[in-house]
From Swiss-Prot:
Cofactor binding annotation: Binds 2 Mg(2+) ions per subunit.
Residues given in the record as D-ribose 5-phosphate binding sites: R194, D218, D222, T223, A224, G225, T226
Keyword vocabulary terms for this entry: ATP-binding, Cytoplasm, Kinase, Magnesium, Metal-binding, Nucleotide biosynthesis, Nucleotide-binding, Transferase
Positions that bind Mg(2+) 2: D169
Subcellular location: Cytoplasm
Natural source organism: Helicobacter hepaticus (strain ATCC 51449 / 3B1)
Pathway: Metabolic intermediate biosynthesis; 5-phospho-alpha-D-ribose 1-diphosphate biosynthesis; 5-phospho-alpha-D-ribose 1-diphosphate from D-ribose 5-phosphate (route I): step 1/1
Name recorded for this polypeptide: Ribose-phosphate pyrophosphokinase
Binding site for ATP: D37, G38, E39, R96, Q97
Cofactor(s) of this protein: Mg(2+)
Primary gene name: prs
GO molecular function (one): ATP binding
SUPFAM superfamilies: PRTase-like
Length: 309
């Protein structure tokens, strides 16, 4: 194995420590402070000369701070003689701004890709990009893992009598179909009409859910409006139970309250983002072992293809 070190930003140190533990190493030392005006100051606490470096930093809220911290850490490591710098970004912020949908708006996902690449990062390891084409915004290797691998294993522990996979909207059909095909289930679609940003209105169910145990799947749960309204409609159409699988628990604004009041029986997420508070309906699955295995294989010059579910 090549000599490597793992550093953690401040976004999710619990996750970083879990990844390091899976690899039987300790996180390398770094100090992250702020100047009196709020600017971020980073100091690397040990030699990295000639080493392969992995920085673990999801760019979740506050996205601007965590992204800037990642870039500054990268610059510090590059100037300290690191050989290769790999950014492990379990949740890739700004991924929803991947194209122009109205005039005179930015493509921020491309801008962020440019910033990451120009900072000196040689490889990005992420999971469930909101838009997979973002991989093409980079001219460096991007490994986009899938949370569905841990969801599949979790579903094996459930005793569903008549399960079926559902996409909460038309945009997620490809993701839901891929998951349904891999686990051998049929697919239904919840069609919705979006009234305004972060608000959704469920309109119709395409498929039969009467007496079924419905498994909603999406890449993220933000305000939870889509998932909760979908669950309510599915139950009204005769669904026996409804659980939601969402890789990234953004859970902003009224999300937790909506989940509590909704017809959702369970919400299953990963620890790609730190959960704000515990919630009786929310189950968190760890993807730290998955990321640790990717790091191990990269350091051994092994293929990571089998880890893409």
């Amino acid at each position: 194995m090549r000599g490597f070190k793992i550093f953690s930003g401040s976004a999710h140190t619990l996750f970083s420590n879990e990844v390091a533990k899976c690899l039987d190493i300790s996180l390398s030392k770094t100090t992250i402070n702020r100047f009196s005006d709020g600017e971020i100051n980073v100091q690397i606490g040990e030699s990295v000369r000639g080493k392969d470096i992995f920085i673990i930093q999801p760019t979740c809220a506050p996205a601007n701070d965590h992204l800037m911290e990642l870039l500054i850490m990268t610059d510090a490591l590059k100037r300290s003689g690191a050989k290769n710098i790999n950014a492990v970004i379990p949740y890739f912020g700004y991924a929803r701004q991947d194209r122009k949908v109205v005039p005179r708006v930015p493509i921020t996902a491309k801008l962020v890709a440019n910033l990451i690449e120009q900072s000196g990062i040689h490889r990005v390891i992420t999971m469930d990009l909101h838009a997979e084409q973002i991989q093409g915004f980079f001219d460096i290797p991007v490994d986009n893992l899938y949370g569905s691998i841990v969801f599949r294993d979790y579903l094996k522990t459930k005793s569903f009598k008549n399960p079926i996979v559902a996409s909460p909207d038309i945009g997620g059909v490809a993701r839901a179909r891929h998951f349904a095909d891999r686990i051998g289930m049929d697919l239904v679609i919840v069609d919705k009409k979006r009234e305004r940003a972060n608000e959704s209105e469920v309109m119709n169910i395409i498929g039969d859910v009467d007496g079924k145990d419905v498994i909603l799947i999406d890449d993220m749960i933000d305000t939870a409006g889509t998932m909760c309204k979908a669950a309510d409609v599915l139950k009204s159409r005769g669904a026996n139970s409804v659980i939601a699988l969402g890789t990234h628990p953004v859970l902003s604004g009224p999300a937790l309250e909506r989940i509590a009041k909704s017809a959702l029986d369970e919400v299953v997420v990963t620890n790609s983002i730190p959960l704000r508070v515990a919630h009786p309906k929310i189950k968190v699955l760890s993807v730290a072992p998955l990321f640790a295995e990717v790091i191990r294989r990269i350091c051994h010059n092994e293929s990571v293809n089998s880890l893409f579910f």
